[in-house]
């Protein structure tokens, strides 16, 4: 199966999402970037259709060598600066409360941990969009 149309349809699904919260919009933005990266890897021959067949292999392809989403985030594979992460995931009032990311988001996490949570959710959205598009194309 050629995944070019599947990935294009999954991208369309993600781009058409109407998220209401700042967190949801941020997670969707991460998902769109992640799917674009996966599509580029597929187009350039770095990953095959088999790599996108199951959750585990697709996640390994998306992680690009990292062990998990925390390592992906802390390793610099996504946004690096606290202010950029805060701007991507927070409402204006949360940005003000954290002084545009200068303060920690909460007592238990750093901004890179928050980003790792968002990336994990983004991959869930990516994989469910790929799975739905694959079923649609097969019919």
Residue ranges and their predicted role:
Residues 16-28, 43-50, 100-109:
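Charged, low-complexity interaction regions
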Residues 73-138:
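Amphipathic alpha-helical binding modules
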Residues 11, 32, 36-39, 53-60, ...:
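Generic structural concept
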Residues 45-81:
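Short, charged early-sequence alpha-helical segments and their helix-coil boundaries
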Residues 18, 39-43, 63, 67, ...:
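A structural signal for well-ordered alpha-helices, especially hydrophobic packing surfaces
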Residues 1-40:
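Short terminal alpha-helical segments
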Residues 10-19, 37, 44, 60, ...:
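Intrinsic disorder/low-complexity segments enriched in polar/small residues
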């Amino acid at each position: 199966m050629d995944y070019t149309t599947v990935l294009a349809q999954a991208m369309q699904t993600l781009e058409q999402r109407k998220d209401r919260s700042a967190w949801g919009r941020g997670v969707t933005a991460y998902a769109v970037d992640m799917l674009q990266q996966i599509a580029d890897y597929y187009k350039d021959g770095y990953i095959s259709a088999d790599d996108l067949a199951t959750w585990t292999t697709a996640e390994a392809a998306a992680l690009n060598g990292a062990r998990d989403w925390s390592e992906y985030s802390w390793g610099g594979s996504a946004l690096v600066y606290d202010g950029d992460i805060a701007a991507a995931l927070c409402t204006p009032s949360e940005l003000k409360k954290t002084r545009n990311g200068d303060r920690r988001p909460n007592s238990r996490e750093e901004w890179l941990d928050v980003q790792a949570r968002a990336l994990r959710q983004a991959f869930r959205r990516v994989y469910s969009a790929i799975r739905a598009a694959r079923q649609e194309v097969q019919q």
